[in-house]
Structure formats: structure tokens, C-alpha cells
Amino acid sequence: ELEAWARTAGHGFLAFDYSGHGESDGAFEDGTISAWRADALAAIDAHTSGPVILVGSSMGGWMALLTALARPARVAGLVLIAPAPDFTEKLMWPEFSPDAQAEIMEKGFTLRPSDYDEPYPITRALIEDGRTWQILDAPIQIDVPVRILQGKEDADVPWRHAERLVDTITSSDLVFTLIKDGDHRLSRDQDIARLKATCADIAHAAKA
């Protein structure tokens, strides 16, 4: 639906799956934040030109932020849905029991239950690599328009995590929308309508 909106509004549109996700090659357990950041940069560098607005959900929100920091001349705006920057260290690692943490460090991985699919492996490489890309502990020097959509009933990314991001990004043109009955995916009809309206707003604000 977002692609249809973009085409109708006269905007280009590019979507992709990170390696080990969706239709892309690779295994999830081989993935790291460094690798997925490289995927995002490669997609933008190879398949787009001019100013771009990045739309990222959950981990994709972290990737959008890292991409904006790496390509400040290219990124004209950000739309972040339930953004999860630093999730490996600040959300995931503290939730693991001492036994699971030990298993990751000694065995190299542990299986994490999922509400959406089969349990999936969280690797030592993912955790340790994620520590090199933490961005919430200092001001995030992004000065383009930013829009954040966050569900208050999100069971995966606490809304306070998104609120912390609001306080960390330097942009003065930042709007944080907290959807009181919204979950993590924000995929209901009203959520999609809100997302499209938000994209239209930021396209105007960014003049992209």
C-alpha cells in the first residue's frame, strides 16, 4: 500500500529485504548489524539518486538512523515505526536469563521464542557487533525532518525506548506520535492510513 501511495504521489519507491530476511539470500543467524547496515547503504547507493526519505520499522528504524548518519547528503527525512535502535544491547541482552547469556557466550547462540514464527537464533556475533553501533548514548546528529510512530501496547519495543530516541536526535523538526492502542506492527487499516499521511507530511516537509 505504501508503494501504491508513493507512485500515485509521484515519488520513486524502493523496498528490500535484509540478508537472511524475507526473500533475500543468506541465513538470519549469519547476520549482524554491520551486515544489515551495509545492505541498506548498498541499496540506496546502487538503486537511488537524489534525496531520499527512509521508512524503517523496528530494526529497520535502527538501520534508517545508521544510514542517515552515513549518508547525510542523501537522506532528506526519516519515518520510523516502532524504531529499535541499540536493541541488541538495550532491549534484548537484558531480557536474557543468565543461563541464556552464558549459552550465547559459550555456545555462540541461543534460541529466542517469537510471537510471529518459530524460535530464532540470537548469536554472539550479533550481540557483540551490535555494541559497535550503539547510538542512544550520545546526541544523534540528524537534522532532517523525523516522524516517529509508536504503539503504546508494543510488546517488543517499549514506547519509552522511542521516547528516549526523541530526546537524543538533534533535529528540531521531529514529531512523535504515540498510538495508545497500537501494537508493534502497526499494520491495521488505520495504522496504514496514518503511515501514508505521515509520509505525505514528511515529503512536504523535506521537499523531496
Can you name each region flagged by the protein language model?
Residues G182-L195:
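Catalytic histidine-centered segment of alpha/beta-hydrolase-like enzymes
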